[in-house]
């Protein structure tokens, strides 16, 4: 079982868990496990089925959103919302499943249903997600962030508001307040 009310560090833990669980495996199916997900994400799941079998190449996260490359220009993405988690057990509020050719099953459970799944283009990924602002995954250009902080502190903003700017500090959440 993985973390409730996930912020950036917890999302990174989830990605590490998925990468360990699915390493060297071939994804054989993506499927819904609940009627709400069938209704809300039926088209996403239908599209994902076009990419199987899929050699698992590893999830990565940018801030609180996680991604799996499914072809040269497309990514499967998920967001945990407030209560989302992945585990090897199907539970009451399980909505989505990834299965591998060796019968490994990983379930997405989200009691409050604030999480989501999507297919994102490479262009959308590059436009909407700022990779360099993710301290958990990339070499952080410290000088660039120091300059940003100094420039914004001059405007007399609260430090917390500056740190919550997801463009520069991906995955930092309200736990700072």
What does each of the following model-derived ranges do?
Residues 70-72, 76-172, 176-177:
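Phosphate/anion-contacting hairpin/loop surfaces
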Residues 4-119:
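Gly/Gly-Pro- and Ser/Thr-rich, intrinsically disordered tail segments characteristic of DNA damage-repair
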């Amino acid at each position: 079982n993985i973390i409730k009310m996930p912020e950036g560090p917890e999302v990174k833990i989830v990605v590490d868990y998925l990468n360990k669980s699915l390493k060297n495996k071939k994804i054989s199916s993506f499927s819904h496990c609940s009627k709400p997900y069938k209704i809300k994400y039926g088209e996403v799941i239908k599209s994902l089925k076009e990419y199987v079998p899929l050699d698992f190449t590893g999830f990565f996260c940018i801030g609180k959103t996680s991604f799996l490359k499914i072809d040269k220009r497309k990514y499967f993405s998920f967001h945990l919302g407030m209560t989302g988690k992945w585990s090897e057990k199907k539970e009451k509020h399980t909505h989505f499943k990834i299965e591998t050719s060796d019968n490994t099953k990983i379930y997405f459970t989200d009691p409050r249903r604030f999480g989501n799944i999507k297919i994102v283009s490479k262009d959308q990924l590059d436009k909407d997600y700022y990779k360099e602002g993710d301290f958990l995954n990339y070499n952080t250009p410290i000088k660039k962030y120091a300059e940003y902080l100094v420039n914004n502190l001059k405007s007399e903003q609260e430090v917390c508001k500056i740190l919550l700017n997801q463009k520069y500090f991906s995955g930092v959440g309200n736990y700072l307040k």
